Amino acid sequence: MAIANKNIIFVAGLGGIGLDTSREIVKSGPKNLVILDRVENPTAIAELKAINPKVTITFYPYDVTVSVAESTKLLKTIFDKLKTVDLLINGAGILDDYQIERTIAVNFAGTVNTTTAIMAFWDKRKGGPGGVIANICSVTGFNSIYQVPVYSASKAAAISFTNSLAKLAPITGVTAYSINPGITKTPLVHKFNSWLDVEPRVAELLLEHPTQTTLQCAQNFVKAIEANKNGAIWKLDLGRLDAIEWTQHWDSHI
């Protein structure tokens, strides 16, 4: 997908990886970039507008833990204004295994709810035009960081959901792929809580190993958007972009 002249909704587009990705997206010249986030950042919004004044950038406050009905109401406002949306990026995430319910609500249920809400406008069975979803998951969904099992499980669930969305594309007209960053230098990973304090130094231990910058991750994210491969499971790690082959151990035969 060429980003130029497209309409894009980016949930959590002002976060660590999110903000650098928004910068890279704006450089590619979309028509509209609509950022949905919990907290407005006027300085960041102004910076994005300055990068490419031809791009219309709009911010709406949004908490992914609201109901599907509330999400649908906000999306209707956006669709009424833009008429069409080409790409939805679900990027909300937290890393704190003390907060079990909120981790699941943000990292998994929030992605499901926002996706469910946009189907009202995209699903071809309802006369919609289809669309593309990029879900930011994590390499911990492949192999867990066992000291943060709640976070890792929430990301594994998000990957599984995304894989199912991709297989449903012939029915819904909506394609999907997952973006799975490795350990990236963001505020998220500098300090976080392990489950039941099984490893108080988990953040320090992770950062002793090779990481990547948010810019490297963002640049590869844009490459994945441009590749636009339905069902792709992208690994963005150590400055590289690699497609992962998912191993199938069971088949439902339906």
From Swiss-Prot:
Q: Which Gene3D superfamilies match?
A: NAD(P)-binding Rossmann-like Domain
Heme found in the keyword field = no
Family named by the database record = Belongs to the short-chain dehydrogenases/reductases (SDR) family.
Q: How does it assemble?
A: Homodimer.
**Which residues are NAD(+)-binding?**
10-33
**PROSITE patterns registered for this protein in UniProt:** ADH_SHORT
Listed InterPro entries: ADH_Drosophila-type (IPR002425), NAD(P)-bd_dom_sf (IPR036291), Sc_DH/Rdtase_CS (IPR020904), SDR_fam (IPR002347)
GO molecular function annotation = alcohol dehydrogenase (NAD+) activity
Q: What are the catalytic residues?
A: Y151 (proton acceptor)
To which species is this protein native? Answer: Drosophila mettleri
Report if keyword Zinc is assigned: no
Question: Which GO BP annotation is one of this protein's?
Answer: alcohol metabolic process
* Entry EC no(s): 1.1.1.1
The UniProt catalytic activity note for this protein reads: a primary alcohol + NAD(+) = an aldehyde + NADH + H(+); a secondary alcohol + NAD(+) = a ketone + NADH + H(+)
Top EC category: oxidoreductase
Its recorded name reads Alcohol dehydrogenase 1
Q: Which CDD domains match?
A: ADH_SDR_c_like
- Any Pfam family matching the protein: adh_short
Positions with a binding annotation for substrate: S138
